[in-house]
Amino acid sequence: MRMEKIDENTIRVLLENDDLEERGITGLDLLSNHKKIERFFYSILEEVDQDHVFANNDAVTFQVLPNEQGLELLISKNLSNLDLNKAQSEMVQGKDGITEYIKDQLLKRDTASSEDDEEDDEIESYLNQADNPTKQVVLGFDTFEDWIALAQQLHIESGVSNLFVYKHQYYAQLVFFLENTTETFVQDDLAVANEFGHKTNYTADFLSEYGQRVMENSALELTRYYFKD
């Protein structure tokens, strides 16, 4: 971990993947484990703020910039009202909202992007039309590593994938758009999926209600991106 004091109100912390691993932080934690990430960020603040100048300030903000090497964390205090208003679209103040901001950054989702919204709307519209045939399967995984291994092997040509966490267990919903593929391709993909996961009685609706959806629509692609070989 490297720390640089940019000025009296801003500290930059560079955390490499090894630093995250040493602290027991995984990519999935950054997406789903609210309490763990909350503790993690404030533990970093405690490490670098030995004089407690930042920790004793109620208006501390965090800006998270993920990269392939790890994370860049900017910690700021004493922002003016103008700067604070400007920063709130880019930064997270205090504990509330930290995980949601990281999730947006890690999934490279621009919440103001109409293109992303339109794509999500198109997928939702397709799934909601009864005359659009789909095949849906939900699989459970013994470990997150099993899910990563599947993501590195399985490339769905026409469909979506969602990743859920429920009671510390990982589940994936695979949805195949049958209009744009063949039964043979679907069966081949399912054969690959069954090598790494196992069938479960849980439905996607159940997991959405009682668990947490941590990757939506492109879970396979996102996992491949963030968990490379």
From Swiss-Prot:
It comes from the Bacteria. GO terms for molecular function: protein-macromolecule adaptor activity. Pfam families: MecA. Homodimer. The N-terminal domain probably binds unfolded/aggregated proteins; the C-terminal domain interacts with ClpC. Belongs to the MecA family. Enables the recognition and targeting of unfolded and aggregated proteins to the ClpC protease or to other proteins involved in proteolysis. This is Adapter protein MecA. It comes from Latilactobacillus sakei subsp. sakei (strain 23K) (Lactobacillus sakei subsp. sakei). The gene is mecA.
